[in-house]
Structures are given as structure tokens and as C-alpha cells.
Amino acid sequence: MSVSQKHPFHLVDPSPWPLLGSLGALASTIGGVMYMHSFTGGGTLLCLGLGMILYTMFVWWRDVIRESTYEGHHTFVVQLGLRYGIILFIVSEVMFFLAFFWAFFHSSLAPTVEIGAIWPPKGISVLDPWGIPFLNTLILLSSGAAVTWAHHAILAGLKQQAVYALIATVFLALVFTGFQGIEYIEAPFTISDGIYGSTFFLATGFHGFHVIIGTIFLIICGIRQYLGHFTPKHHFGFEAAAFYWHFVDVVWLFLFVSIYWWGGN
């Protein structure tokens, strides 16, 4: 097996995964619409499409890890391109959350008469920001410190220490997700309670979804670190996970300050 390539550029091999992923996305979209309108077979098609997407994600990323770790395809130029890619991806995620913050501030800065011309809307009992939300803020910031600890350990060649740091990060992420679930269960309002409920659950819910994705990302990095895939000079997979996790931290700080603290007063 070749362990290097004669050029520094990112040229991918022929792969069936883009086609399979596209078919999975098509099936899940059509199946989702059919399921929402109670058509026969909609749920089955939706599950099939989601299964295809999950399988594609697994095998495609498996191939990327093989190309990077065992075949030497990720040269400096390729890694630079991947860094630009993850940065642009995070910028697109910023735009995604910007829509939710825009909806929240549009509604809260100039509340309409339909909601009592006040914010929070009349009849809404808000959550105490200094309870679970503040605790979750401390937990998520601690997880950000732990992932930074893991990064420095990898740079220093301390394999075991990096594994421990990633375990701590994943543990804190799971605790955060658990507390978020408890908060949702005990919330005195629902997503159907007007603009406050919809913006609250959409913004915090999508953030929670990103936390789950980031947790899976970090678990994979922990396994790879345990297997010795990362070196002080070659660990972009971990760097991408760390970039993503710090983005999740920053979004939560904005959510806490704007929706929980300012928006709840």
C-alpha cells in the first residue's frame, strides 16, 4: 500500500458515497413529507432514507480517515484546504443561528399587541436563568477548557493525557445534554406557546442538536487518539472537532445572555 502521493493536492478517488448520500437525502425528504401528510409508507421511506444517510456518513468518514492516517493523502496543502472548509462550514452555521436570534430580537424589541405589547409575552412564565441554564453554562465552558487541554496534550505528544481530557469533555457534554432535557421536561411553556416558545425551543433545540453532533465527533476523536491516529504534527480531525466545539460554546453564551437572561426579564 502506498503511504504517500507525488503531488500535494486534494484529488479524491471514485466513490459511490456521494450518490448514495444524495439518494438517502431524497428518500428522507419525500418520506418525511409523506409521513406528515399520513400517506402509506411515508414512515418506512423516511427511516430508509435516514438509514442510508447514517450509513453514508459512517463509510465516507471511514474512507477519509483511511486516506489521512494510512495512505498519506492529507498533505500540508490538503490540510490547509480542509481548514478553510471547516471555517466556512462554521461561518454557515453562524448564519443559521443568526436567523433564530433575528427572529427573537425582532419579536422582543418591538412586541406586538397580540402578545400584550410586552416581553416576555403576557401569560408566559419564563425559566430562571440562574438555575439550570447558568449551571449548563459553567459545564459547557468547562468542556471547552477540557478540549483545549486535550489539544495541548496532543501537541506535547502526551497520548494518555489527551485521552483523559477527551473523556472529560465527552462526560461534560453528556451532563449538559441531560440537564437540557430536564429543563425541557420541566419548562412551563411549550413550542406552541406563541413566538416566545417557538424561538426558545428552536434556538436552544438546534443548539442541543449541535451539542449531540459535537459529542459524537469528540467520541470518534477519543477513539482515534486511543488508537494512535493523531500526532503532534498531524491531527486535523481533532482540530476540526475542537473548532466545532468552541463554536458550540460561543453560541450557548449568546443564547444564555440574550434568551435566558435578557429575554427573561
Swiss-Prot record:
Transmembrane segments: 16-36, 41-61, 85-105, 138-158, 162-182, 200-220, 242-262
GO cellular component: mitochondrial inner membrane
Keyword Transport appears in the UniProt entry: no
Membrane topology listed for this record: Multi-pass membrane protein
Pfam families linked to this entry: COX3
Catalytic activity: 4 Fe(II)-[cytochrome c] + O2 + 8 H(+)(in) = 4 Fe(III)-[cytochrome c] + 2 H2O + 4 H(+)(out)
BP-aspect Gene Ontology terms: aerobic electron transport chain
Coiled-coil intervals: none
GO molecular function: cytochrome-c oxidase activity
EC number: 7.1.1.9
Subcellular location: Mitochondrion inner membrane
Keywords per UniProt: Membrane, Mitochondrion, Mitochondrion inner membrane, Translocase, Transmembrane, Transmembrane helix
Subunit structure and binding partners: Component of the cytochrome c oxidase (complex IV, CIV), a multisubunit enzyme composed of a catalytic core of 3 subunits and several supernumerary subunits. The complex exists as a monomer or a dimer and forms supercomplexes (SCs) in the inner mitochondrial membrane with ubiquinol-cytochrome c oxidoreductase (cytochrome b-c1 complex, complex III, CIII).
Family affiliation: Belongs to the cytochrome c oxidase subunit 3 family.
Function: Component of the cytochrome c oxidase, the last enzyme in the mitochondrial electron transport chain which drives oxidative phosphorylation. The respiratory chain contains 3 multisubunit complexes succinate dehydrogenase (complex II, CII), ubiquinol-cytochrome c oxidoreductase (cytochrome b-c1 complex, complex III, CIII) and cytochrome c oxidase (complex IV, CIV), that cooperate to transfer electrons derived from NADH and succinate to molecular oxygen, creating an electrochemical gradient over the inner membrane that drives transmembrane transport and the ATP synthase.
Name the record gives this protein: Cytochrome c oxidase subunit 3
